[in-house]
From Swiss-Prot:
One of its GO terms (biological process) is complement activation, alternative pathway. This is Complement factor B. Residues 477-754 form the Peptidase S1 domain. The keyword Glycoprotein applies. The unliganded VWA domain has an inactive 'locked' conformation whereby the scissile Arg-259|Lys-260 bond is protected from proteolytic activation. It is an enzyme of class 3 (hydrolase). Monomer. Interacts with complement C3b; this interaction is dependent on the presence of Mg(2+). Glycans are attached at residues 122, 142, 285, 378. The lineage of its organism: Eukaryota, Metazoa, Chordata, Craniata, Vertebrata. Residues 1-25 form the signal peptide.
Length: 761
């Protein structure tokens, strides 16, 4: 019926890909067993402790759902004793203990009522809100106490709509002074003793009916932002900034444009990365933050966004690694190379913390831009991303530089045109040493946005960037995946399709395919026969139970399995490609996305090649004359697995192709070119490495090159020399697989997919 194990009709996917590789779980490096301070009597009831920073710092650890009271951190003093156990309101405590995490109770609720009323609320407790007659509820009517000591949902507000500005509400745990909401009226928020206010202490009713600043919250020392909360808030805020840049060029930021943002190469957005390398941060956190910034840059670039970058690391003194004026500051690869070269040890000899000097370097970069581009500087949007613990012990208050930056950029000076959209300062605080008050003072404060975040450890920062840079706005980009540790096989191979054919005499037979557009799946022609009825063909996608119906099968016109039977060649797989047109248009989601096709605008963007790149130049980039790392996706035990292979396209190509003559049915073929035409790519064998081989149900699946965090299909799995999956322990060295080279069938693909908005070159 087929050559080797074919046809394979059996069952066989600012601001980041897999981020922060190598970032461990410990906030700071653990010290040895010795400490200058005695460990006698430092135990915590219900928990444990560990030493950090060569025994100079002691961190208390508690089980999930509990927090260290009265403090998480103690420092070893020069007197040889540990810092006193005292609460944030300076109450002395004799012994540390792990207390249950609770959520703050409402201090007040205007124009309505809530229940149940309690002195405190435990994890998973719920609270409900109701408004009096004449008032309408905004926000969440029901809220649940979460594991980080915060309530889910949004602040519940009862408003009658009769005031110039809407009632700004009283976030749970805060107190508000001021109940008049006329133009220029102000409200002030307070926290109870021992809690830190994050957000805006004072808010003013502005023209247009909005409030200045951002909604406040009262934070206890044990409270952290979850990765999901940070990702959603940061992405939402940063996306608005980027879309604003797009709108400056006269484009409406529609859904499609949100997915394909291309910034003005002259620099309509500048991103400044500021990384704290001081002694209080520690080598582990510094390296982890550096890795996250590296992958942030990589991921942003994979979306086709090209801002200009500035990079500053600092301790006692700042080091400017990249200036936005550098010729290559918008080239992600070069920026990443510069970032990779920095080390925590660069600041070892002067390990103080001078945040003000670091921000002055950012100010100086902005000032040069203002002076150099006098005509256009006021259309440039600036994003500052600061990674720090918020501690500073020299140089003065860094907030003064923030004020200078705002003045330089003419932000907040004109009430009718405050230009707040042109500056966003995000501060990420990581680990147990974070000073919440200081990081809040540095960050931007905007209505309905969050710019300051405190995370529990580096692994949480990793989660933030994974979630933050892979949201619904990018679903239309080809070759994108969600590589997060919690992702399913179809999150990681979202293009993968399973095609099932029901034949009355043979039952069910299956192939693989790849989503290439909203209507089409690319697969192998030999997966079908001329007698197959459309209603007997079903397509499964995204690991879902739903089956998509087929409208038609489009074969390559030169495909003919029986073309060389007269020459004694039973099956001939040249031009073994087909397109499956679906009846229903696909709605892209995280488990259903297209793969990139060669010589399209999508693959040019994915590879970050110049727009002037030709199809031939792209082919030389992806398929040079050498062994090429590639992969295919195989199904085993109902799960998808990537298999790494090498395309033999150099000096091993001829020997790879010659092994085709060892396939059953080809024994009498003298000239390998009779069965292996220029349309084929060859993988398999044991040189330079033992490649895995495809199995029966893998036919029609994509042969893929993974480059620059994107996945580009270069081939379609067609046939193999040996069915190795019948005897996986006895794989001969001549086991080879052959794939249709998509570059060789591009005219046909371009013709059939011309209405799919793929932008063929």
């Amino acid at each position: 019926m087929g050559i080797g194990h074919n046809p394979r009709l059996c069952l066989v996917p600012l601001i980041l890909g897999l981020l922060c590789g190598g970032v461990g779980m410990t906030p700071l490096p653990e010290a040895g067993p010795q400490s200058p301070c005695s460990l006698e009597g430092v135990e915590i009831k219900g928990g444990s402790f560990r030493l950090l920073k060569a025994g100079q710092v002691l961190e208390y650890l508690c089980p999930s759902g509990f927090y260290p009271y009265p403090t998480q951190i103690r420092t070893c003093r020069s007197t040889g004793s540990w810092s006193t156990l005292q609460t944030q309101d300076r109450k002395i405590v004799k012994r540390a203990e792990c207390k249950a995490i609770r959520c703050p109770r409402p201090q007040d609720f205007e124009n309505g009522e809530y229940w149940p009323r309690a002195a405190y609320y435990n994890l998973s407790d719920e609270i409900s809100f109701r408004c009096y007659d004449g008032y309408t509820l905004r926000g969440s009517a029901n809220r649940t106490c979460q594991g980080n000591g915060r309530w889910d949902g949004e602040t519940a507000i009862c408003d009658d709509g009769a005031t110039y500005c809407p009632n700004p509400g009283i976030p749970l745990g805060t107190r508000k002074v001021g109940s008049q909401y006329r133009l220029e009226d102000r409200v002030t928020y307070y926290c109870n003793r021992g809690l830190t206010l994050r957000g805006s202490e004072q808010r003013t009713c502005l023209e247009g009916g909005s409030w200045s600043g951002t909604e406040p919250s009262c934070q206890d020392s044990f409270m952290y932002d979850t990765p999901a909360e940070v990702a959603e808030a940061f992405l939402s805020s940063l996306t608005e900034t980027i879309e604003g840049v797009d709108a400056e060029d006269g484009h409406s930021p529609g859904e499609q444009q949100k997915r394909k943002i291309v910034l003005d190469p002259s620099g309509s957005m500048n991103i400044y990365l500021v990384l704290d390398g001081s002694d209080s941060v520690g080598a582990h956190n510094f390296t982890g933050a550096k890795n996250c910034l590296r992958d942030f840059i990589e991921k942003v670039a994979s979306y086709g966004v090209k801002p200009k970058y500035g990079l500053v690391t600092y301790a006692t003194e700042p080091k400017v690694l990249i200036r936005v004026s550098d010729p290559k500051s918008s080239e992600a690869d070069w920026v990443t190379d510069q970032l990779n070269q920095i080390n925590y040890a660069d600041h070892k000899l002067k390990a103080g913390t001078n945040t003000k000097r670091a921000l002055l370097e950012v100010y100086n970069m902005m000032s040069r831009e203002v002076n150099q581009f006098k005509e256009t500087w006021n259309r440039t949007r600036h994003v500052i991303i600061i990674m720090t613990d918020g501690l500073h012990n020299m140089g003065g208050d860094p907030v003064t530089v923030i004020h200078d930056i705002r003045y330089l950029l003419d932000i907040g000076r004109n009430r009718k045109n405050p230009r707040e959209d042109y500056l966003d300062i995000y501060v990420f605080g990581v680990g147990p040493l974070v000073n919440q008050e200081n990081i809040n003072a540095l960050a931007s404060k905007k209505d309905k946005e969050k710019h300051v975040f405190k995370l529990q450890g580096m692994e949480n920062l990793e989660d933030v960037f994974v979630q933050m840079l892979d949201e619904s706005r990018t679903l239309g980009l080809c070759g994108m995946v969600w590589e997060h540790k919690d992702g399913t096989a179809y999150h990681k191979q979202p293009w993968q399709a399973k095609i099932s054919v029901t034949r009355p005499s043979k039952g069910h037979e299956s192939c693989m395919g790849a989503i290439v557009s909203e209507y089409f799946v690319l697969t192998a022609a030999h997966c079908f026969t001329v007698d197959d009825e459309k209603h007997s063909i079903k397509v499964s996608l995204g690991g879902q139970r739903k089956e998509w119906e087929v409208k038609e099968i489009l074969f390559h016109p030169k495909y003919d399995l029986n073309a060389k039977k007269a020459k004694g060649i039973p099956e001939f797989y040249d031009y073994d490609v087909a397109l499956v047109r679906l009846k229903e248009k696909l709605k892209y989601e995280t488990t259903i996305r297209p793969i990139c096709l060669p010589c399209t605008e999508g693959s040019i963007q994915a590879l970050r090649l110049p727009r002037s790149t030709t199809c031939q130049q792209q082919m030389q980039e992806l398929l040079p004359a050498k062994d090429i790392e590639a992969l295919f996706v195989s199904e085993s035990k109902k799960t998808l697995t990537r298999k790494a292979v090498y395309i033999k396209n150099g000096d091993k190509k001829a020997s790879c192709e010659r092994d085709a003559l060892r396939a059953p049915g080809y024994e009498k073929v003298k000239d390998v070119s009779e069965v292996v035409t220029p349309r084929f790519l060859c993988t398999g064998g044991v040189d330079p490495y033992a490649d895995p081989n495809t199995c029966k149900g893998d036919s029609g699946g994509p042969l893929i090159i993974h480059k620059r965090s994107r996945f580009i299909q270069v081939g379609v799995i067609s046939w193999g020399v040996v069915d190795v999956c019948k005897r996986p322990q006895q794989v001969p060295g001549y086991a080879r697989d052959f794939h249709i080279n998509l570059y060789q069938v591009l005219p046909w693909l371009k013709e059939k997919l011309q209405n799919e908005d793929l932008g063929f070159l």
